[in-house]
Amino acid sequence: MVAVAILAAGRGTRMKSNLPKVLHRLGGYSLVERVLNSCQLLNPSRQLVIIGYEGEQVRDSLQQLDSLEFVEQKEQLGTGHAIQQLLPHLEGFQGDLLVLNGDVPLLRPQTLENLLNIHKTHRNAATLLTAHLPNPKGYGRVFCDNNNLVTQIVEDRDCNAAQKQNHRINGGIYCFNWQQLAAVLPKLSADNDQKEYYLTDVVKFLAPVMAVDVEDYLEITGINDRKQLAMANGILQNRVKDHWMAQGVTLIDPDSITIDDTVELQTDVIIEPQTHLRGKTSIGKGSRLGPGSLIENSHIGDNVTVLYSVITESQVASGCRVGPYSHLRGQAQIGESCRIGNFVEIKKSVIEQKSNVAHLSYLGDATLGEQVNVGAGTITANYDGVQKHRTIIGKGTKTGANSVFVAPVTLGEEVTVAAGSVVTHDVPDRALVIARQRQRIIEEWKKTIESKK
């Protein structure tokens, strides 16, 4: 049985932000969400989030997650003080406690699983995650015997010249036997320059304490400022892109492409430069995206082409061509084999298969049947100043260039709309609608004007 405690009480002053540090986003999740995700493979019996600065904001951001317990640290007096706040909450708990930092978001689930397994196998009082860094400056050094049992942890500022040659550092990730830890937590002292209670100080009261090296030291990258957040994003992006290229996805210029790790891609997808996939997005096999496109929280079917376009909260079925310079938003649903072309905006509309909206159009709150052809410059006037209204256009209808449909209005099937029409009333099946001023020519108009000068 294992409980997880996540340290999420700090403000993160170096972020220069009103937002708590752990709520800054990395890919599709906040930092603290990523930490929570990393430990789900362990199936923890309890998950406790220690909150402090803007604690209600942290709590509200995680309210969609089940089984979280929130523990308040009213004063931020160090990591040891944070864990002391768990004493009344874990009274009588008989298992192990895994301690994670809410600002260390790149841990792999397998790393934590390995840490816990070694901890249990050796029946350690404490097991900590360590790493060998090329440049360990600023990190506490961990000293071990030949059996990886910890003999000493020395903070960087307290290391002498010889100790600084040790590149094995403390990653700040711990697994404790809770009952043994609970017995020594009251012994912690704030007798140091920072006047804080350090969790590392419990090591001198516990035995055995073992160190376990992380396979990739980048996993323990912590976030303290915007530069480190950007570095972590680069590490995450490399992981994600390496994964998808190994699965049969082509990235034309990986450095210019971003893909959230919440995105799902099928084989033979091709992603062109300056394309960004975000949120809960899925892309079907053989689709070609970009260059210069943004797709967020959307589903794209098989063999779709998206060129210089923005698609958010929408669905595009197989065989469609979108762009250049199209904007789909607000639950737009595009059926199979449709063409959505240059400078077209579609909002909260359903367009059925084999329909074309090729140029310079706005369709909002509309439903188009199959094989509708929308002429250039077609607009649905869906807002009366108070509420939105729907436009319904039946199967096989053709709208002329520069048409306006003043909603609510319904056009039947196979209707022909003359160019320049402003349609305000329903139109029956197979009708021709001409809703424009009859052309009038006044000859010699120029001469009339000149005579008045």
Swiss-Prot record:
One of its GO terms (biological process) is cell morphogenesis. Keywords: Acyltransferase, Cell shape, Cell wall biogenesis/degradation, Cytoplasm, Magnesium, Metal-binding, Multifunctional enzyme, Nucleotidyltransferase, Peptidoglycan synthesis, Repeat, Transferase. Mg(2+) binds at D103, N224. CDD domains: GT2_GlmU_N_bac, LbH_GlmU_C. One of its GO terms (molecular function) is glucosamine-1-phosphate N-acetyltransferase activity. Residues 227-247 are annotated as: Linker. It holds the Pfam family Hexapep. Its cofactor is Mg(2+). Residues 1-226 are annotated as: Pyrophosphorylase. UDP-N-acetyl-alpha-D-glucosamine binds at residues 7-10, 21, 73, 78-79, 140, 155, 170, 224, 329, 347, 362, 373. Acetyl-CoA binds at A376, N382, Y383, A419, R436. Residues 248-453 are annotated as: N-acetyltransferase. It catalyses: alpha-D-glucosamine 1-phosphate + acetyl-CoA = N-acetyl-alpha-D-glucosamine 1-phosphate + CoA + H(+); N-acetyl-alpha-D-glucosamine 1-phosphate + UTP + H(+) = UDP-N-acetyl-alpha-D-glucosamine + diphosphate. It comes from the Bacteria. It is found in: Cytoplasm. Catalyzes the last two sequential reactions in the de novo biosynthetic pathway for UDP-N-acetylglucosamine (UDP-GlcNAc). The C-terminal domain catalyzes the transfer of acetyl group from acetyl coenzyme A to glucosamine-1-phosphate (GlcN-1-P) to produce N-acetylglucosamine-1-phosphate (GlcNAc-1-P), which is converted into UDP-GlcNAc by the transfer of uridine 5-monophosphate (from uridine 5-triphosphate), a reaction catalyzed by the N-terminal domain. This is Bifunctional protein GlmU. It comes from Rippkaea orientalis (strain PCC 8801 / RF-1) (Cyanothece sp. (strain PCC 8801)). The gene is glmU.
